[in-house]
Amino acid sequence: MSLKVNVHVRDQMYSIFCGPGSQKVRWLSDVALHRYEHFNNGSDPGLAKGMRFETGVLIDMEWTISDKLENDVHVWVILKED
């Protein structure tokens, strides 16, 4: 099964396909921040200090995606500047 996670950075949302989801959650934030920069004319969003669920519950950046996140879930990147 291939997992898809919807990652929000500021006012943008990126669907990230993770394959079997063996990556760490930190990888999701890295991919989302690179996409944000690419699609916003090089605008640097800054560094991620964490991620959270829609409920506000924090996500451990060292979790393995497939162990803790469900397919098609929405998560938000928390930026150091926020």
Where are these regions (language model features)?
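Short structural boundary motif marking the start of a folded domain
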Residues: 1-5
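Short, contiguous acidic and Ser/Thr-rich linear segments
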Residues: 8-31
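Eukaryotic basic, amphipathic alpha-helical target segments in cytosolic regions
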Residues: 36-40
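Short acidic beta-strand-loop surface patches of small beta-rich interaction domains
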Residues: 42-67
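Loop/turn positions that initiate beta-strands
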Residues: 70-75
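Short, charged beta-turn/beta-strand-edge "cap" motif at the junction between a beta-strand
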Residues: 81-82
